Amino acid sequence: MPYQQITINVNDAVAERLADALMEHGALSAAIEDAYAGTQNEQAIFGEPGMPAEQIWQQSKVIALFGEHDEAAAIIQIAAQECGLKDLAYTGETIEDQDWVRLTQSQFDPIRISDRLWITPSWHEAPEGTAVNLRLDPGLAFGTGSHPTTRLCLKWLDTQLKNGESVLDYGCGSGILTIAALKLGAGSAVGVDIDEQAVRAGKDNAEQNNVDAQFFLPDGLPQGQFDVVVANILANPLRMLGEMLAARTKQGGRIVLSGLLDEQAEELGGIYSQWFDLDPAETEEGWARLSGTKR
């Protein structure tokens, strides 16, 4: 059975209300996406400690699905009126029914990080059976290996981590770096995130990968220092957390920072140079990674 798919560009003030109104009046589904997804103006939305969390992109698109014979135009008009919108422009297309699970899975292929490290969704065969394969499915927590900052951190772990070292992954998201550290030889690894959903996702992913990782909310993190501290978050929390991350790093231990843009590396380097001897920044697709050794 074919469906009508309608796309409406709106601002963040009305996106959620419009999606709810469309559902209330008969849409089969309504999703909100970044209107600039896939372009240079794409807007990343993450919660930052101490900052109000943005929930909706400033410019969003509401994508609604209707049945083949639904009066989509009339429903859109009613929903628009309820949201105080006039002359609401939209585009529409007909899409055929299909196996949506299979379609979604087909969009995620194994990701090669290095000669020996792969990120592989659970529904794929491991591309190289003798390689280190992280089984990780796209989900609700950030971190699938596709983002440059995640790859930068994974490459550091792949080449620099020493067997038996203890690792703290602060802002762990899906737990990808925590799990990778253990698979690459860490003696222990702990993931921390401000989002309970990320903590749950980390535990689930660790179980899927048969590794003994621990995950905590910040208040639950036990006292202690680590040989390696990794923080793949954003520039603002990295500014705020510098002293704490330094305190969690053993003397002679190492820190790995990412989630910052190339142009932010110099400023962040100035902050962390209080505690660490920093290596030259590594960059990929406009994102940067800092690393260094604690004095």
Swiss-Prot record:
S-adenosyl-L-methionine binds at T150, G171, D193, N232. Pfam families: PrmA. CDD domains: AdoMet_MTases. GO terms for cellular component: cytosol. It catalyses: L-lysyl-[protein] + 3 S-adenosyl-L-methionine = N(6),N(6),N(6)-trimethyl-L-lysyl-[protein] + 3 S-adenosyl-L-homocysteine + 3 H(+). GO terms for biological process: methylation. The keyword Transferase applies. Its EC number is 2.1.1.-. It is found in: Cytoplasm. InterPro entries: Ribosomal_L11_MeTrfase_PrmA, Ribosomal_PrmA_MeTrfase, SAM-dependent_MTases_sf. Keywords: Cytoplasm, Methyltransferase, S-adenosyl-L-methionine, Transferase. Coiled coil: none annotated. The keyword NADP does not apply. It is an enzyme of class 2 (transferase). GO terms for molecular function: protein-lysine N-methyltransferase activity. Its main location: cytoplasm. Methylates ribosomal protein L11. Belongs to the methyltransferase superfamily. PrmA family. This is Ribosomal protein L11 methyltransferase.
